[in-house]
Swiss-Prot record:
<comment type="subunit">
    <text>Homodimer. Interacts directly with alpha and beta subunits of the 20S proteasome but dissociates before the formation of half-proteasomes, probably upon recruitment of POMP. Interacts with PSMG4.</text>
</comment>
<dbReference type="InterPro" id="IPR018788">
    <property type="entry name" value="Proteasome_assmbl_chp_3"/>
</dbReference>
<dbReference type="Pfam" id="PF10178">
    <property type="entry name" value="PAC3"/>
</dbReference>
<keyword id="KW-0143">Chaperone</keyword>
<dbReference type="InterPro" id="IPR053720">
    <property type="entry name" value="Psm_Assembly_Chaperone"/>
</dbReference>
<dbReference type="GO" id="GO:0044877">
    <property type="term" value="F:protein-containing complex binding"/>
</dbReference>
<dbReference type="GO" id="GO:0051131">
    <property type="term" value="P:chaperone-mediated protein complex assembly"/>
</dbReference>
<comment type="similarity">
    <text>Belongs to the PSMG3 family.</text>
</comment>
<comment type="function">
    <text>Chaperone protein which promotes assembly of the 20S proteasome. May cooperate with PSMG1-PSMG2 heterodimers to orchestrate the correct assembly of proteasomes.</text>
</comment>
<dbReference type="GO" id="GO:0032991">
    <property type="term" value="C:protein-containing complex"/>
</dbReference>
<feature type="modified residue" description="N-acetylmethionine">
    <location>
        <position position="1"/>
    </location>
</feature>
<keyword id="KW-0007">Acetylation</keyword>
<dbReference type="GO" id="GO:0060090">
    <property type="term" value="F:molecular adaptor activity"/>
</dbReference>
<protein>
    <recommendedName>
        <fullName>Proteasome assembly chaperone 3</fullName>
    </recommendedName>
</protein>
<dbReference type="GO" id="GO:0043248">
    <property type="term" value="P:proteasome assembly"/>
</dbReference>
<dbReference type="GO" id="GO:0005829">
    <property type="term" value="C:cytosol"/>
</dbReference>
Length: 122
C-alpha cells in the first residue's frame, strides 16, 4: 500500500504588485487552508463553507464567516472572490483563508489568485 501523507502543503513566494507575498496552501481531509500574507502574519481568518442551494445542487454557495480580525463587508467579498475556485476545484470542500494584504484591489486579487494556483494541493 502506498503511504500518502495525511497533510499535503505547498508554499510559494512571489512579488505581487511590487510587494513580496507568501502563499501557503495545505490540504486536510475536509478543509483547505490558504494563507496569503504580505506582512509575515496570518491577519484576518475567514471560513468559507459551501452550502447547497435547493434549486441548483451543482453550484453550492459559499458562506463566509470571519473568525478572527476585521469583520467588514469588503473582507467577505474579497475572500469569496479570492478562493471560491479552490473550493470548487477541491470538490466543494470548505476553505479556511488567512489573509494579510496591503490592499484589496481587483489587480491584486487577480495576481494573488495566480499565486494560489501555483500552490495547488487539492
Amino acid at each position: 500500500m502506498e503511504d500518502k501523507p495525511l497533510v499535503v502543503s505547498k508554499q510559494k513566494t512571489e512579488v505581487v504588485c511590487g510587494v513580496p507575498t507568501q502563499v501557503v496552501c495545505t490540504a486536510f481531509s475536509s478543509h483547505i487552508l490558504v494563507v496569503v500574507t504580505q506582512f509575515g502574519k496570518m491577519g484576518t481568518l475567514v471560513s468559507l463553507e459551501p452550502s447547497n442551494v435547493a434549486n441548483d445542487i451543482s453550484k453550492p454557495v459559499l458562506t463566509t464567516r470571519v473568525l478572527l480580525g476585521q469583520d467588514e463587508p469588503l473582507i467577505h467579498v474579497f475572500a469569496k472572490n479570492l478562493v471560491a475556485f479552490v473550493s470548487q476545484e477541491a470538490g466543494n470542500r470548505a476553505v479556511l483563508l488567512a489573509m494579510a494584504v496591503k490592499d484589496k484591489s481587483m489587480e491584486r486579487l487577480k495576481a494573488l489568485k495566480e499565486v494560489i494556483r501555483l500552490c495547488q494541493v487539492w
